[in-house]
Curated annotation (Swiss-Prot):
Annotated active site: C400 (amidino-cysteine intermediate)
Name the UniProt record assigns to this protein: Arginine deiminase
Pathway(s): Amino-acid degradation; L-arginine degradation via ADI pathway; carbamoyl phosphate from L-arginine: step 1/2
GO molecular-function terms, A-Z: arginine deiminase activity
Gene Ontology terms: biological process: arginine catabolic process to ornithine; arginine deiminase pathway
Annotated catalysed reactions: L-arginine + H2O = L-citrulline + NH4(+)
Predominant localisation class: cytoplasm
Native organism taxonomy: Bacteria, Bacillati, Bacillota, Clostridia, Halanaerobiales
Amino acid sequence: MFKKSPLNVTSEIGKLKKVLLHRPGHEIENLTPDLLERLLFDDIPYLKVAQEEHDAFAQTLRDNGVEVLYLHELAAEAIQEDEIRKKFIEQFLDEAGVIGKGARQVLKEYFADMDNETLIRKMMAGVRKKEIPAIEKVASLNDMVEEDYPFVLDPMPNLYFTRDPFATIGTGITLNHMRTETRNREVIFAEYIFSYHPDFKDTEIPFWFDRNETTSIEGGDELILSDKVLAMGISERTDAASIEKVARNIFTDGQPFETILAFKIPEKRAFMHLDTVFTMVDYDKFTIHAEIEGPLKVYSITKGDNDELKIDEEKATLEDTLKKYLGLDEVTLIRCAGGDYIDAGREQWNDGSNTLAIAPGEVVVYNRNHTTNRLLEEHGIKLHVIPSSELSRGRGGPRCMSMPLVREDI
């Protein structure tokens, strides 16, 4: 007998009750300048300070009544059974590209005596070759060819951006297929949590998207504007075809959602996901990066006849489109740093538009984006300001670093 889904997120701004985070770990200290591009980082955060900043973020949430869960703990609890643990290790090594016979065997032996939490942390951190016994060079050609590479298992430094590998929508999730091989490895943790964790395994959680799909989607491109309207980004990381798949699944499942607004944003690093340039902070207020307003196209996706999708390009301004679909008389777009070319460019690079709402009109923001923060306050938004000198080096803000599991309905 399946139990009711323990998930419930029907807005961006409903009071946040439960959230999933990942505290940065030793994966950050396995970054080197030579590996930054491969691992999708622009800089190397100082781990000690990054952890202090992340702890301040988590405490801010707790102080406001939010239950904070951690990714490594849930993942460890999901693989308690021996057969599931063995399956998890084999799949993890497959997805990490550990194909050399020697490397694979040595890693399995290395993992064998670890408890589950230590195992998960080590998988996240990556394994340097000098940590393990020498790989027999006769084991495989692949092992010999890769002998100069410092890792037998790459680190996963993007994990503290828990927003992207999966996304809670309503009572279900999209289990995402991420654009890059580096980040697609992260999805395995969510896969096992929702399949095998005691809190989730026997519950009715619909999957709006499956990670085995061939097109890409990432959680930073998935926003819930109301219990009837979703916003999704067609971006550097999310394909239009993926949005159509989500739409078909949601519209045929009896969920309350009636419309998906698909935002086509420029494909560039600074605008990686929709939530780096557009977030909801109150019933009728949104942050936006002014640079996307010109080239922005918005398409509405609704349920058509015979279970087909009806797709139209919205010709009105963004304000009018939002008013139309959200049933609002007025909409306020709060431009990152007021739209000033220099200030907005700087603050958007440090996620000035990437806010996390914990209640209507109440958001968590980075302290470094002082111009945008002042504008938010001038528009009546209550701010919870967190330190950000090191966390921001990963190119993600408070929304990127959090995956809501439960919000109050509004």
